[in-house]
């Protein structure tokens, strides 16, 4: 359950609180994974009526089912299948949003083995339909998070079909850093609003 501050508009903000608001927050220090931080961010967006974005369920291959009762089935063996698309999708201000989230402890690059061909194909299809598609890349050791447009990911992937790692320099050059916070933890919609809907990114 995510707790949100009550009546944020009515609260008086002091200079110190303003500084704290803009201070980067490391969600890992609070025992939260990158995925959990994104889920909490999406819950915040939903609660505030900002956007409706959800994590897609991981597909499961059912292998064995027992029927202890005629009217009740029990799955006793199943396996997670490889996801065929991306992690998250939804809608923001009438725009379709679709993205993947990846995390690494490496300091200089993001392993491309984390991305699969069918995911790249899915992202290309989303872009063809004018959807907003991207990846959120978190470098845990550096405590840095980046929004990388899907086109930049696809362009790099096509160089070697995902056999190498994507240098951090490439990500910094072609993406945008997401400043982590408290509410929401991973404010990626700020990038979309400023760089895409605002018309800065071409």
From Swiss-Prot:
Keywords: Cytoplasm, DNA damage, DNA recombination, DNA repair, Endonuclease, Hydrolase, Magnesium, Metal-binding, Nuclease. It holds the Pfam family RecU. The record marks 102 as: Transition state stabilizer. It is found in: Cytoplasm. InterPro entries: Resolv_RecU, Restrct_endonuc-II-like, tRNA_endonuc-like_dom_sf. GO terms for biological process: chromosome segregation; DNA recombination; DNA repair. Its cofactor is Mg(2+). Its main location: cytoplasm. Mg(2+) binds at residues 85, 87, 100, 119. The keyword Membrane does not apply. The keyword Metal-binding applies. GO terms for molecular function: endonuclease activity; magnesium ion binding; nucleic acid binding. GO terms for cellular component: cytoplasm. Its EC number is 3.1.21.10. Binds 1 Mg(2+) ion per subunit. Signal peptide: none annotated. It catalyses: Endonucleolytic cleavage at a junction such as a reciprocal single-stranded crossover between two homologous DNA duplexes (Holliday junction). NCBIfam families: PRK02234.1-1, PRK02234.1-5, recU. Belongs to the RecU family. Endonuclease that resolves Holliday junction intermediates in genetic recombination. Cleaves mobile four-strand junctions by introducing symmetrical nicks in paired strands. Promotes annealing of linear ssDNA with homologous dsDNA. Required for DNA repair, homologous recombination and chromosome segregation. This is Holliday junction resolvase RecU. The gene is recU.
């Amino acid at each position: 359950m995510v707790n949100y501050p009550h009546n944020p508009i009515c609260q008086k903000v002091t200079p110190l609180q303003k500084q704290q608001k803009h201070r980067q927050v490391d969600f890992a220090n609070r025992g939260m994974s990158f995925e959990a931080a994104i889920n909490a961010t999406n819950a915040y967006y939903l609660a505030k009526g900002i956007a409706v974005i959800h994590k897609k369920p991981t597909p499961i291959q059912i292998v064995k089912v027992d029927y202890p009762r005629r009217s009740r089935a029990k799955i006793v063996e199943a396996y997670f299948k490889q996801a065929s698309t991306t992690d998250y999708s939804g809608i923001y201000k009438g725009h379709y949003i679709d993205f993947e989230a990846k995390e690494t402890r490496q300091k200089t690059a993001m392993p491309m083995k984390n991305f699969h061909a069918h995911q790249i194909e899915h992202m290309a299809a989303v872009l063809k339909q004018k959807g907003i598609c991207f990846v959120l890349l978190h470098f845990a050791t550096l405590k840095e998070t980046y929004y990388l447009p899907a086109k930049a990911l696809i362009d790099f992937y096509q160089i070697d079909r995902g056999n190498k790692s994507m240098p951090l320099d490439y990500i910094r050059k072609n993406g945008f850093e997401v400043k982590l916070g408290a509410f929401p933890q991973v404010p990626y919609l700020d990038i979309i609003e400023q760089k895409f809907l605002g018309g800065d990114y071409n």
